[in-house]
Amino acid sequence: MAESRANPASPGTRSYFNAPVFAVAPMIDWTDRHYRFFARKLSQHALLYTEMIVAEAILRGDRQRLLGFDASEHPVALQLGGNDPVKMAEAARIAEEFGYDEINMNVGCPSDRVQSGTFGACLMQEPETVAACVAAMKAAVRIPVTVKCRIGVDDQDPEVALRTLVAQVVEAGTDAVWVHARKAWLQGLSPRENREIPPLDYGLVYRLKQENPNLFIGINGGLQTLSQALEQVQHLDGVMLGRAAYHDSAMLTAADGHFPHPLTGAAPVAQEAGVFTERGHRLDLDFWADVRDVMADYAAGHITNGGRLIHVTRHMVGLFQGWAGARRYRQILSSDATRQGAGPEVIHAAFDAVFEAMAAKQAAE
């Protein structure tokens, strides 16, 4: 079992998860409950995050719609947006009642919409506010409370800004810090540009870990492959992939062979040589047939409850990159899933296009 690292700033409380942790980053409009259900079929050990949900929305809105999730999604963390300690604490308490495994505070999103609410990355300029929110949430819940931040914003010196924030949230009792290892520019860059243009500084995050050996520190930003993720955990306690894991979701099937289960500490799953592609995609067609059947059943249930097939299948389009039949798979999901009355048969047809192409390829070899 991997070592479980406890935060010395909060003695007696539950420690954070078993390291090293592999996580899929919170992504607005992407990591909704349908994506997380799908991702969990691909990896049992990945820590999954919700898209950011504003604390005020939880207090005033439809909590079941905002917070409800399938039990199979565990381990699953809720990312909260906000800056009011009282509201953040109450939202965290409600989320704990729903069964989430972690509450994560967003101190990294630079979008105009998030800035207009004075939360997200702009809170890098208000470490005292972040610390107050962390302390209030820690007092309200028993599950881990964590922070996801940038290394700084605008003209801040990252060497100072990151250390200042981390020192204050450690004092407040945070269980972990996840760092997107680049600055955010609050004006002049779009959210997409803020993920690509500011230079990465992994070295600063490594130094932060050396200075805080008992604090769980994970890294995010610029990571595209499982190999790159494995390199990061030579230095840190966790690694978080975002869009790469979403657009090439089959890579999640290899994660369990390298990372323990965050909650149980179950060891990485032994994987036979030759059962994965160079991209880290599992080749076992029986496994993929099970994914097909489970997702078709899930989609049928969603449709029965008034939803549309596209709500589910939009998260599945990136599967099978580089495989025979992948183009036809994408065509089916992109076109047929949007038609009126589309049902789970579309998922069967898309997967079967890959299976048939793979069988033809193998027969020709």
Segments predicted by a language model, with ranges:
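Short, hinge-like loop/turn segments at secondary-structure boundaries
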Residues: 65-69, 121-123, 163-165, 194-197, ...
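Short secondary-structure transition/capping segments
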Residues: 59-63, 115-118, 158-159, 189-192, ...
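Alpha/beta catalytic cores of nucleotide-metabolism and tRNA/nucleoside-modifying enzymes
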Residues: 1-18, 22-23, 28, 135, ...
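Active-site beta-loop-alpha junctions enriched in small/polar residues
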Residues: 27-29, 53-55, 81-83, 108-110, ...
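Alpha/beta enzyme core
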Residues: 89-103, 107-119, 128-215
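Glycine-rich, positively charged N-terminal anion/phosphate-binding segment
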Residues: 2-11, 16, 27-101
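Conserved beta-strand positions in the central sheet of alpha/beta enzyme cores
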Residues: 23, 48-49, 77-79, 104-106, ...
